[in-house]
Amino acid sequence: ISEVKMDAEFRHDSGYEVHHQKLVFFAEDVGSNKGAIIGLMVGGVVIATVIVITLVMLK
């Protein structure tokens, strides 16, 4: 359920800061290894998105 919710939040164009704070809270809430892996994957997606947007802006 939380994965779908986070996916919906990513489609919503709010600030990256907000996403980062939600990721931190999400990581603190989930203590299992699965939660940590999901958190890392989502964090990687955010970083990749920022890089892509930066490259597009520079062109």
UniProtKB/Swiss-Prot annotation:
The keyword Heme does not apply. Residues 59 are cytoplasmic. One of its GO terms (biological process) is cognition. Gene3D superfamilies: Amyloidogenic glycoprotein, amyloid-beta peptide. It is a single-pass type I membrane protein. Keywords: Amyloid, Cell membrane, Cell projection, Coated pit, Cytoplasm, Cytoplasmic vesicle, Endosome, Membrane, Nucleus, Secreted, Transmembrane, Transmembrane helix. It is found in: Cell membrane; Membrane; Perikaryon; Cell projection, Growth cone. Pfam families: Beta-APP. The record marks 13-14 as: Cleavage. Proteolytically processed under normal cellular conditions. Cleavage either by alpha-secretase, beta-secretase or theta-secretase leads to generation and extracellular release of soluble APP peptides, S-APP-alpha and S-APP-beta, and the retention of corresponding membrane-anchored C-terminal fragments, C80, C83 and C99. Subsequent processing of C80 and C83 by gamma-secretase yields P3 peptides. This is the major secretory pathway and is non-amyloidogenic. GO terms for cellular component: cell surface; clathrin-coated pit; early endosome; extracellular region; Golgi-associated vesicle; growth cone; nucleus; perikaryon. It comes from the Eukaryota. Residues 1-34 are extracellular. The keyword rRNA processing does not apply. Its main location: membrane. InterPro entries: Amyloid_glyco, Amyloid_glyco_Abeta, Amyloid_glyco_Abeta_sf. Belongs to the APP family. Binds, via its C-terminus, to the PID domain of several cytoplasmic proteins, including APBB family members, the APBA family, MAPK8IP1, SHC1 and NUMB and DAB1. Binding to DAB1 inhibits its serine phosphorylation. Interacts (via NPXY motif) with DAB2 (via PID domain); the interaction is impaired by tyrosine phosphorylation of the NPXY motif. Also interacts with GPCR-like protein BPP, APPBP1, IB1, KNS2 (via its TPR domains), APPBP2 (via BaSS) and DDB1. In vitro, it binds MAPT via the MT-binding domains. Associates with microtubules in the presence of ATP and in a kinesin-dependent manner. Functions as a cell surface receptor and performs physiological functions on the surface of neurons relevant to neurite growth, neuronal adhesion and axonogenesis. Interaction between APP molecules on neighboring cells promotes synaptogenesis. Involved in cell mobility and transcription regulation through protein-protein interactions. Can promote transcription activation through binding to APBB1-KAT5 and inhibit Notch signaling through interaction with Numb. Couples to apoptosis-inducing pathways such as those mediated by G(o) and JIP. Inhibits G(o)-alpha ATPase activity. PANTHER family: ALZHEIMER'S DISEASE BETA-AMYLOID RELATED, AMYLOID-BETA PRECURSOR PROTEIN. This is Amyloid-beta precursor protein.
